[in-house]
Each structure stands twice: as structure tokens, then as C-alpha cells.
């Protein structure tokens, strides 16, 4: 039996699709490319924007056309938020919510036996237990592995549907995280990326200040995971997929700087550069608090890599607010700025707010901010010119005779090579590279040692 996957959305979805694939392989399935003929197709959906919903529906229809007799399984956030809408799409056989992914092998077997369409979706208030999908240890042609450490979010930002799609905060057991990391490192992975719906919330519900208001001196929260993984022997590095300034502050990120294996890069989601808009978004920090975190990191390491998310066209966003977002991106010299046009989502407070921004204004602001973000990244790359960086080599661009990889501070580096066989042997290796000049979406470099 053959099974194919199409995954939309975030790194958590990618991780979960790999875990689901591993579970089906244990049942004797062969995983094939989504464009190939398969007996089962799994679409792992996203619902962060209306565009994501539309893409999910398109892929459902597309996969059924490849094999009209296949079993089509739709899971993920869109399936959780709009199960009836997903069920109504022609060709869908099984709809499974976000906390049902570990049961998909059973659901498919049941469908193949009885041929009855299935709907397995709990209400978000019932999503209160971590759904352990098992260890992901596929090491074929890979250098970077993702480990999911937590599920859910309780922040309820006014624009965001994800708390309804993912449920309450649930943290994965530390022993399971360490066991997965050890297997991945033993299997040859050189970079472990810690991911989750809101990684900063890992075990934070258990933390209480003492009577003097002091927080624990020993590692807590996501730092606890970093400390445990740092003790694993081997030549590898750890990367945090993101930290929310809505959860952590400058004092907390300062604690993370002592871990040598932790990459000097952080995705720090701003969402806006305007304190007024941040308040309307129900983000519990202002621009000044965000900049305090940035300053703390850059004072410790002027070349610390930062990336971010910005929403343009949030209800009530004025031109001055938008200019605040532009200036934030300029000042922070982000290595990458992800830009989203505000999209009205079900169940959210922002959907009923006054002052919705016209589509053409959102488009104009998005285009402008893309230009600002590109210049911000180029400025960050230029600051790194002439530096020596340790690069993990990942991919050969044979038609260009380039080998590419990433620095710890998340700069994509292009290094020319002459001997294809030797270059192939350097994949998944750390090498020292001199960063020479801004190039494409990163920098061109010169290898100084193998």
C-alpha cells in the first residue's frame, strides 16, 4: 500500500506529518511523493488565514483526482476549526482534528474495512492532553530535525484562531524529548530545532514566583529543555523555532545566552511595531519591551540573528501605526521578516472590530513592508561581511556548482566548489566559512577548512 502527504502551514504540521508517516510505515505502507498514485492521501491543513483554507480545499480536490479510489484523510487546524465545511468537500473520506493524528492508522484501516465516512473532531475545550505521536527518526538526506515540545496556546491574541484549533497548553514530557533528540543525533542529524505551537509556554503553567517575586534560579520553561539537550554528547547545535515576547522578557532570554550549543538566532514574533496596535491585538507587551529583548540579545552578540512576523492591515491600523512597523523592521535588522495581510478568522475578537482596512491598502502596505524587510535583511548580512562563521552544509546546487548551508545566526551561505564528489562528502558537516558579500537571499562565502 502507498501513502502520500501534503502539508500546509507551520513547522509543527511538518513534524506531525513526519510522525504520521512513520506510523504508517510501521504498518507496512510505503510513503510516496504527493504527485504519485497512492492508496491513501493525507492532507495536513492550516487555517491561519483564509488563503490557507482555500489552499487546503484545492489540495483535497487535486489529490482525489490522482486516484479517485483512494482514501482521502484531512487533518490539521482547518479540519479542527471547520469540520463540516471540510466534510462537504467532494472526495473527503476521513476528517480528523488536531488531537487525533496518532489514531489515523486505525481510522484508515476502519474505513478500508467498512467504507464509511468518518468525522473525528473534539471541541477545543476538550483538547487538554498531549497527543504523543511517537519518535521521528527518519535520517535520510537530512541535516536538520524538528522536535515538538508542546501543544496548544492560551494567549488568545485577538486576531488568532490557533487557540481554538490547538486547544489548551500541553507540554511534552522531558524524557520523551531527550529520547527523540538522542536518537536523531545518533542517526546523524546535526541540528535540532525545538518547535511547538507556542514554545515559550513549555511548562510555564507550573512556574510560580516565590514570596519575594523571584523566579527559579534553576532552568525552567523551554530553558529546561535546552539544558537537558545540551548535556547530550555529540557535535550538534540546538535552534529555537520561536519565542513569544508575549510570554518571555529580556531577563529570560538573557538566561539562554549561556548555552553554547544554542544557535544565536531567534524568531521573535513582533506582529506590529505600534504599541497601540499591539494592545488591540491583546499582545501583553509594547514596542519598548520588544526592543528591550532585541537590545539584550544584540548587546551580548551584535551579530545575533533575529527574524519576525508582522501583520499589516489589522483593524484600526493607521498609516502612523504602519510606519511604526516599518521603522521597527529597519531598526532591528531582521534576517527575515514574514509579512501577513490581516485575515478575518472565526471565533476571534478582531473579526468584529471596527475599522477594517481595505484590501488595496493591505496590499500596498504589504508590498512596502516587503521592500523594507528585504533592505533590513541585506543590512544584517552586510554587517556580517568579513566574519568567520561555522556553517552546516545542507544542499548541493549542482547546476551552479554551489553548496549551501546556514550559519548559527541563520544566514544562508553559498559556497562555490570545484570537485562534486568532495562537495557531496561535505554535506551534513560543519565547516568554517568566511562571509564575503551579500548574495541573493544570504551571503557568498569562502571555505577556509573542511
Where are these regions (language model features)?
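Proteins enriched for Cys/Gly/acidic motifs involved in redox and nucleic-acid/cofactor modification
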Residues: 1-202, 218-221, 251, 266, ...
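Short, solvent-exposed loop/turn segments at secondary-structure boundaries
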Residues: 52-54, 168-175, 203-207, 280-283, ...
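Conserved SAM/AdoMet-binding glycine-rich loop
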Residues: 72-73, 81, 186-319, 330
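Glycine-centered loop/turn positions within well-structured domains
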Residues: 102, 155, 167, 200, ...
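Short flexible coil/turn linkers enriched for glycine and charged/polar residues
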Residues: 140-143, 153-155, 262, 272, ...
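Conserved, mostly hydrophobic/aromatic
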Residues: 157, 177, 194, 240, ...
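Short acidic, glycine/proline-enriched helix-loop-strand junctions
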Residues: 210-213, 234-235, 350-362
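Terminal RNA-binding accessory module
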Residues: 352-450
Amino acid at each position: 500500500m502507498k501513502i502520500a502527504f501534503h502539508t500546509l502551514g507551520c513547522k509543527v504540521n511538518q513534524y506531525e506529518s513526519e510522525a504520521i508517516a512513520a506510523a504508517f510505515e510501521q504498518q507496512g505502507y510505503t510513503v510516496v511523493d504527493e504527485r504519485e498514485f497512492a492508496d491513501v492521501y493525507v492532507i495536513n491543513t492550516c487555517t491561519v488565514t483564509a488563503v490557507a483554507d482555500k489552499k487546503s480545499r484545492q489540495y483535497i480536490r487535486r489529490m482525489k483526482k490522482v486516484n479517485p479510489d483512494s482514501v482521502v484523510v484531512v487533518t490539521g487546524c482547518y479540519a479542527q476549526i471547520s469540520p463540516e465545511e471540510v466534510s462537504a468537500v467532494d472526495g473527503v473520506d476521513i476528517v480528523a482534528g488536531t488531537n487525533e493524528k496518532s489514531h489515523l492508522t486505525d481510522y484508515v484501516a476502519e474505513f478500508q474495512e467498512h467504507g464509511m465516512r468518518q468525522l473525528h473532531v473534539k471541541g477545543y475545550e476538550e483538547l487538554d492532553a498531549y497527543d504523543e505521536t511517537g519518535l521521528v527518526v527518519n535520517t535520510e538526506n537530512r541535516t536538520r530535525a524538528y522536535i515538538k515540545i508542546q501543544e496548544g496556546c492560551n494567549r488568545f491574541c485577538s486576531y488568532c484562531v490557533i487557540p481554538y484549533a490547538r486547544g489548551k497548553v500541553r507540554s511534552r514530557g522531558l524524557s520523551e524529548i531527550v529520547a527523540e533528540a538522542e536518537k536523531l543525533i545518533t542517526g546523524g542529524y546535526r541540528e535540532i530545532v525545538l518547535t511547538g505551537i507556542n514554545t515559550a509556554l513549555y511548562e510555564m503553567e507550573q512556574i510560580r514566583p516565590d514570596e519575594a517575586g523571584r523566579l527559579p534560579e534553576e532552568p525552567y520553561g523551554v530553558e529546561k529543555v535546552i539544558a537537558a539537550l545540551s548535556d547530550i554528547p555529540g557535535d550538534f547545535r540546538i535552534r529555537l523555532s520561536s519565542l513569544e515576547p508575549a510570554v518571555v522578557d529580556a531577563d529570560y532570554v538573557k538566561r539562554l545566552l549561556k548555552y553554547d550549543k544554542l544557535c544565536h538566532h531567534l524568531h521573535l514574533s513582533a506582529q506590529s511595531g505600534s504599541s497601540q496596535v499591539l494592545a488591540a491585538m491583546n499582545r501583553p507587551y509594547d514596542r519598548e519591551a520588544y526592543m528591550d529583548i532585541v537590545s539584550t540579545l544584540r548587546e551580548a552578540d551584535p551579530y545575533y540573528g533575529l527574524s519576525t512576523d508582522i501583520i499589516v492591515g489589522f483593524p484600526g491600523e493607521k498609516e502612523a501605526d504602519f510606519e511604526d512597523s516599518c521603522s521597527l523592521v529597519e531598526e532591528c535588522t531582521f534576517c527575515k521578516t514574514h509579512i501577513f495581510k490581516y485575515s478575518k478568522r472565526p471565533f476571534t475578537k478582531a473579526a468584529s472590530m471596527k475599522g477594517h482596512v481595505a484590501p488595496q491598502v493591505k496590499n500596498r502596505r504589504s508590498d512596502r513592508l516587503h521592500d523594507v524587510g528585504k533592505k533590513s535583511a541585506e543590512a544584517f548580512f552586510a554587517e556580517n561581511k568579513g566574519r568567520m562563521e561555522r556553517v552546516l552544509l545542507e544542499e548541493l546546487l549542482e547546476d551552479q556548482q554551489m553548496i549551501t548551508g546556514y550559519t548559527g545566526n541563520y544566514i544562508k551561505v553559498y559556497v562555490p566548489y570545484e570537485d562534486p564528489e568532495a562537495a557531496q562528502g561535505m554535506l551534513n558537516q560543519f565547516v568554517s566559512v568566511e562571509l564575503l558579500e551579500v548574495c541573493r537571499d544570504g551571503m557568498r562565502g569562502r571555505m577556509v577548512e573542511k
